[in-house]
A protein has these predicted regions:
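Polytopic alpha-helical membrane proteins, predominantly small-molecule transporters/carriers
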Residues: 1-147
Length: 147
């Protein structure tokens, strides 16, 4: 059940990510300075924490396919941060950008996962209903957000 706590932690972290990054970008008056700060945070959290957690014995037995896939996943995460910064730079605000990002991401995740691991049986039609409701939900969040 720990996974639920960690998933909630990720939701909280990413929920605050957009508004705080947007504020930092505005205060720095340069999106590339904000991206540099994101990169520094990624380094601190994404390199130093695992090094400490793995310890000297954990730095062995890396597989090529594991390294390639994990690095590609990390690069996609960093690319997502770059796209968010450019969305802000080009007039998007966190209250609009983040619902689009976090509404679209689960749909892409499920479609990609189904492509990589085709379902063994029939797909429940409610999956497609849920996917159709994502843009409706994002639209409602965007339209009715407090001003």
């Amino acid at each position: 059940m720990w996974w639920v706590i960690f998933a909630i932690g990720a939701a909280l972290s990413w929920g605050f990510y957009g508004p705080i990054l947007g504020k930092g970008q505005a205060l720095l008056q340069n999106p590339m300075k904000a991206l540099l700060c994101v990169g520094a945070a990624y380094f601190l959290m994404g390199v130093l924490v695992p090094l400490g957690a793995l310890g000297p014995s954990g730095l062995t037995k890396f597989t090529q396919s594991g390294v390639v896939n994990a690095t590609l996943g990390g690069a996609l995460g960093a690319l997502g941060a770059i796209f968010i910064i450019y969305a802000f730079k080009n007039g998007g605000v966190p209250a609009y950008v983040m619902p689009l990002v976090f509404g679209g991401a689960p749909v892409i995740n499920v479609l990609y996962s189904m492509w990589m691991h085709p379902p063994k049986g029939d797909i429940n039609p409610l999956l497609w209903v849920g996917m159709a409701l994502v843009p409706v939900g994002a639209g409602l969040v965007l339209y009715y957000k407090p001003s």
